[in-house]
Amino acid sequence: MVNSNEEDERRILDVEESLLTQEEVNNHLTGLSSTAEDGSIDIYGNPPSKKKTGNWKACPFILGNECCERLAYYGIAKNLITYYTSELHESNVSAASDVMIWQGTCYITPLIGAVIADSYWGRYWTIASFSAIYFIGMALLTLSASLPVLKPAACAGVAAALCSPATTVQYAVFFTGLYLIALGTGGIKPCVSSFGADQFDDTDPRERVRKASFFNWFYFSINIGSFISSTLLVWVQENVGWGLGFLIPTVFMGVSIASFFIGTPLYRFQKPGGSPITRVCQVLVAAYRKLKLNLPEDISFLYETREKNSMIAGSRKIQHTDGYKFLDKAAVISEYESKSGAFSNPWKLCTVTQVEEVKTLIRMFPIWASGIVYSVLYSQISTLFVQQGRSMNRIIRSFEIPPASFGVFDTLIVLISIPIYDRFLVPFVRRFTGIPKGLTDLQRMGIGLFLSVLSIAAAAIVETVRLQLAQDFVAMSIFWQIPQYILMGIAEVFFFIGRVEFFYDESPDAMRSVCSALALLNTAVGSYLSSLILTLVAYFTALGGKDGWVPDDLNKGHLDYFFWLLVSLGLVNIPVYALICVKHTKKKAL
């Protein structure tokens, strides 16, 4: 007989939660708690009430913060290559390289923010502090684009090589603002998605399901900001002026900060667990010191605390896994330690959970590395896709379409695809796979990898046809670029969201900011690698006085060859990724 309280609870389970197994529902109903049990605290340092904090009631402020911050970021990034060529008078190759390096830096600095968040400040204060740095960088960049003394003289209708270059002082002001933004975003990127996911209690099956949906809507909010940047801001920058075009995203960055602080009373906070780098080093040192000791046949003899939670603040225990057994020696209790009870030195003896943290990082690395190729392909959206579009017919009656604004098709398809994926595709696929999320994170990422290759292949085909038409002095319509943007947009929905969720779910509790930063570092390495490949290809194909594959005048080059090179790289990567996925072992929290 089910009592009235249980009946009330069952009514609460909506369509979103129908993917829970009956066992999970029953366990939840019998062990219902009014406070979160994942180690989080509220603003007063107490266990947070499920009714008053977190969950979807806190998420609008986090999603609003992310939407406005991404609008600010993409308000700079989407058309930055045009600013380099038209305002700073750089060549196509130099401008593309500079943009890729800056974008790469924006995805490396999250390592700084992540370590600070997980070790010392926590995610909330890291986001707050780095947002201030971000805003200062935006303001400085706006001044650089607004004051005539801080930018080169206008040079319309002349090749970039013949224009006056920016002075050292002008570059100094511009790059200071640009790289302050890169530093500021380093404290936000690795923390905000994890901070949003922290609002859902991982020990509550209903909230765990909602957390999976949160990642979809988190990426949806990112693309709302991107959509506005790709349309309104790009048009303002190219038709009204760069000063106003940079001022608008600066204002939205201020709105982003305000949105974040307003939601403070509703947030759940995870305590920082200490330096993850130190814990990794402790495991390696302890394992080395006990290299000659034998592992016990019964793993229950490995050292672990008897408490419910681990010794690491804000972290649950992790179940022991096979593999990398040499690391298990860090948790072997020596004869001396057993007799003396000297268990307090983590440089000599580590818990199983601490050892499993290191194993988890090692297992993540192959997945991380195989995603670099996707980042190489994706980086073309803001660089060579834009330059390709600039060489096409962009006139509709009297209106000239800014080529960077075509990124709106990528954004639109993301905005359309996420609700379809979350509300229709997941329930449909779940019928066949039996997986609550429809697809595993790794399957989702694999589909994204394949679609990104198709996108670059579409760009290569368009470029081949465009070059043939250019020989007859016929300009191909820029609207032929739409398929490549659409394919890359669908690839984003699968790969990017899958990657964010994979690195959050698989990461140890006290390393979630760091692991989110590692996912972003993947994008950084991809941007740098893309820049390196482009520079090398441009150099070697231009030897002997040739124009090369990527000259300033693309009609004299072979950008299609470069795109096919990237397609080949992507096709080689897909089977490698599949093999890595087959061998991957998932983390299991206790």
Curated annotation (Swiss-Prot):
Highest taxon of source: Eukaryota
Modified-residue entries (Phosphothreonine), positions: 126
Subcellular localization: Membrane
Pfam families: PTR2
Residue ranges crossing the lipid bilayer per the database entry: 96-116, 130-150, 168-188, 214-234, 242-262, 365-385, 401-421, 445-465, 478-498, 524-544, 562-582
Expression (tissue specificity): Expressed in shoots, roots, stems, leaves, flowers and siliques.
CC per GO annotation: plant-type vacuole membrane
Record flagged with keyword Transmembrane helix: yes
Keyword Metal-binding: no
Membrane topology (UniProt): Multi-pass membrane protein
BP terms from Gene Ontology: oligopeptide transport
Family, similarity comment: Belongs to the major facilitator superfamily. Proton-dependent oligopeptide transporter (POT/PTR) (TC 2.A.17) family.
Main location: membrane
Any GO molecular function: transmembrane transporter activity
InterPro entries according to UniProt: MFS_trans_sf, POT_fam, PTR2_symporter_CS
Keywords: Membrane, Phosphoprotein, Transmembrane, Transmembrane helix, Transport
Protein name: Protein NRT1/ PTR FAMILY 8.5
Gene3D superfamilies per UniProt: MFS general substrate transporter like domains
